[in-house]
Amino acid sequence: MKTEINKNPQISVIIPCYNSEKYIEDTIKSVLNQSYQSFEIIIVDDGSTDNTTAIIKKLEGKDSRIKFYEIMHSGRPSIPRNYGVKKSSGSFIAFLDSDDLWTREKLKYQSDYLADNKEIAFVYSMSYTFGDVSLLSDLYELLPLPFRAARDREGLIRIGNTITLSSVLVRRESFENVGGFDEDPEQKLEDFDLWLKLSETEKFHLIPRIHVYYRIHGSQFSSDWEERDKRLKYLEEKRNIRLPVHKNFRRKSFFLLLIRNLIHLLFYLCYKSIGYAENRDKPAI
């Protein structure tokens, strides 16, 4: 029996995908199993060449809340995300990468907060990193520790992007007012750019609970310092800001990164010793 669609969903969940056959089904299930059910799922395939589309179409046939679109391959996630928003109807927009997972209460916690706090444009939650992670990974960027979370624009600029895209719920009006994601081919930090645009005039809030399982792949860790420097420089020029994290990248100091990561690893082990990792909610799959 096909699950019928909510005619007036409050939340639109946007999932871009490309060759995601390995994880896409679990990702979609983690949305379908939410305790909060007033949503639609907008999936936009960016020209997959594997079995991704067949998997999605099978799920779409069982649940009318799933709406599937296919576009020509762009190679830039900002394009299918913006396309998905245009096809959606919810008052709130959530983004979910095709290999990440949500916990069961993610949408409920966030929608309740935005309903009670009209002055807040978007909320984000903490994330738990899993997948191809090792001690060689940049732990500073991965660990979901609340002491390094940005809570305002100043924090974003000072600390860098601590907001996992899959953890965000944003008001449609706020998203559209800033023009959505930057689709410029030179823009490689489109999520960070979006938070910076929103925070120029709007407030955001951290919900200190783990609501996202953020999957890490070994290929995500690059030693290409020049490319990282280029991305940050572009963002600085685009938004006319100065990012301290850019200065750190320009130093290209492995020693400084190592010391920084060891400090954060120590904090992580302390959190683990008090049950931080074990007591988290599980994915809704």
Q: Model segments located where?
A:
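The conserved acidic donor/metal-binding loop of glycosyltransferases
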Residues: 97-101, 126
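Conserved donor NDP-sugar-binding/catalytic core segment of glycosyltransferases
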Residues: 105-139
